Amino acid sequence: MERYENLFAQLNDRREGAFVPFVTLGDPGIEQSLKIIDTLIDSGADALELGVPFSDPLADGPTIQNANLRAFAAGVTPAQCFEMLALIREKHPTIPIGLLMYANLVFNNGIDAFYARCEQVGVDSVLVADVPVEESAPFRQAALRHNIAPIFICPPNADDDLLRQVASYGRGYTYLLSRSGVTGAENRGALPLHHLIEKLKEYHAAPALQGFGISSPEQVSAAVRAGAAGAISGSAIVKIIEKNLASPEQMLAELRSFVSAMKAASRA
């Protein structure tokens, strides 16, 4: 959890927002996936949001569902994902690493064992996409026992009660949804979120990162101008992977220029 605090303090000093890319671990295969993650970090990513392949990712649009399918086709298992996470942490000791999960994967070996394994490999946060705040007690309690930040989603239509709960239970960062629905670069997020961000700050919530539909540098600078601590981009990055499956080096080159431009926009 301290890695998030350190990151946001440093970015604050530099008057920058965070740019956080999302990819699915093991897409399109373990070796290339590790190269992709190194490229994201080397190109300026401030933190990572990583998915573990899951057969039925409800909150995700077709782009990220396809990433899951590619990782499955490559035979990637949750155990291998944890091995990858250990390698990433060893190579990049300071970057915050967040997991985006579904509850079934957490339940598989028992909730406590899951968070213990996260702690062991150096994961900083876990967002369980299909567990609402009111059902989150066993997850967030296990997370905190193992020094893992429980991450909560703040939807654009959140009422005051939900904002208070998210602020009270969340650590690390708050995942601020640009809009309702499934993830995807084609569904551009454009709701006025500054009022939600102000409320979250008033209730001392963890810093808000805006996600869902973030696919251009302009959207990153708009999120930061609205008061968010930064932005998360997933589908736009996964599309670059999908488009360049036949040319791995081209894939890394395109990821490099995309992430550099998105990060540059967080300084605007």
Curated annotation (Swiss-Prot):
Pathway involvement of the protein, from the record: Amino-acid biosynthesis; L-tryptophan biosynthesis; L-tryptophan from chorismate: step 5/5
Catalytic residues identified in the record: E49 (proton acceptor), D60 (proton acceptor)
One MF annotation (Gene Ontology) recorded for this entry: tryptophan synthase activity
EC nos: 4.2.1.20
Matching Pfam families: Trp_syntA
Catalytic activity: (1S,2R)-1-C-(indol-3-yl)glycerol 3-phosphate + L-serine = D-glyceraldehyde 3-phosphate + L-tryptophan + H2O
Residue ranges the record marks as coiled coil: none
GO CC terms of this entry: cytosol
Keywords annotated in UniProt: Amino-acid biosynthesis, Aromatic amino acid biosynthesis, Lyase, Tryptophan biosynthesis
PROSITE patterns: TRP_SYNTHASE_ALPHA (PS00167)
NCBIfam families from the UniProt entry: trpA
Similarity annotation: Belongs to the TrpA family.
Annotated function: The alpha subunit is responsible for the aldol cleavage of indoleglycerol phosphate to indole and glyceraldehyde 3-phosphate.
Complex and partners: Tetramer of two alpha and two beta chains.
Name of this protein: Tryptophan synthase alpha chain
